[in-house]
Amino acid sequence: MPLAVKRIANLGQHKAIVTLGVIIKGDTPHFDFVAGECARGIADVTLEYDLPIGFGVLTVNNVDQALARAEEGEANKGREAALAALEMADLLERLS
């Protein structure tokens, strides 16, 4: 995901990006590595391109938890990530 986000950021056509995905924990520590590197990579792109990126990547124990966080309404984590990215883009514009 970080590579795809970097390619989009490199286009220079967006004021913000929103990442959406889910990482479901299995029986090995692989989950921790994938989740951590995904977050770190996206944070690196944010700082490299000075571009707000809403982090809507869910880290859950099972599919039911993912579905609960993706339901319509105020608690939707994708919605929260999009709003955070838009608010940060607005703040950065006001600070420039």
Language-model features: locations:
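Glycine-rich phosphate-binding loop
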Residues: 3-42
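Short glycine/serine/threonine-rich phosphate/pyrophosphate-binding segments
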Residues: 1-2, 66
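C-terminal binding/interaction regions
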Residues: 36-96
